[in-house]
């Protein structure tokens, strides 16, 4: 004889937590990129555990991409130019939702069209394992409102300027930005190692 299932709701997981609590947790991923556990962002970062992040490059209506320069006191990549926005994907959040949230929190940009260019696992310079989804956002006519606690400068660059920096002055750029340029995810590759034809 089969037991009758209980009508009582079982509180069996952290996803039953209030939304404001979930926004402080990240999903740790197993080897196939599937979430298996929740933890705080601080714990995941400290231990270098595999988690998801988003990288976003914002383009204006002229096709130029916005870059931000990290502060000299930034814990990672101090003083280097980086993608427009970067951030963690919180528990229960899609990468698209995280990209929209980060664009608004870091640059004050809302409603920009997002296009996911790809997702790749990598290890950052601190040894943290990450699954990064790269997005192009825009074109947007809104001027980014830089968060001065995160960056000391911001600028729009065109394809030739960005590819010139990535080819000749890599020491000024984050590895993630160089990777995105070389992959042709910001501007299409037309010839050469990653230069426009």
Task: Tell where the protein language model's regions lie, with residue ranges.
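Charged phosphate-binding loop/patch that engages nucleotide di/tri-phosphates or the phosphate backbone
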Residues: 173-197
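Conserved Nudix-box catalytic region and its N-terminal flanking loop in Nudix hydrolases
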Residues: 43-60, 64-101
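Sterically constrained small-residue positions within well-ordered secondary structures
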Residues: 19, 47, 74, 125-127, ...
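Acidic, metal-coordinating catalytic segment for phosphate/diphosphate chemistry
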Residues: 3, 10-55, 61
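Short, mixed charged/polar active-site loops
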Residues: 35, 65, 128
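Unchanged
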Residues: 87-172
């Amino acid at each position: 004889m089969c037991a009758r299932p209980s009508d009582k709701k079982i509180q069996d997981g952290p996803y039953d937590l209030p939304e404001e609590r979930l926004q402080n947790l990240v999903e740790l991923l197993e080897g196939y990129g599937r979430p298996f556990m929740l933890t705080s962002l601080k714990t995941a970062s400290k231990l270098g555990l595999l988690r998801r992040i988003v990288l976003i490059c914002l383009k204006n209506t002229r096709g130029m991409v916005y870059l931000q320069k990290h502060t000299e006191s930034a814990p990672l990549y101090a003083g280097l130019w980086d993608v427009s926005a970067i951030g963690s994907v919180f528990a229960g959040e899609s990468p698209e939702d995280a990209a929209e949230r980060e664009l608004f929190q870091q640059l004050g940009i809302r409603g920009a069209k997002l296009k996911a260019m790809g997702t790749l696992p990598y290890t950052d310079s601190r040894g943290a394992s990450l699954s990064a989804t790269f997005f192009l956002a825009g074109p947007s006519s809104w001027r980014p409102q830089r968060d001065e606690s995160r960056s000391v400068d911001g600028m729009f660059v065109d394809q030739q300027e960005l590819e010139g920096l990535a080819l000749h002055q890599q020491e000024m750029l984050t590895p993630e930005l160089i990777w995105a340029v070389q992959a042709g995810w910001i501007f299409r590759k037309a010839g050469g190692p990653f230069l426009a034809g």
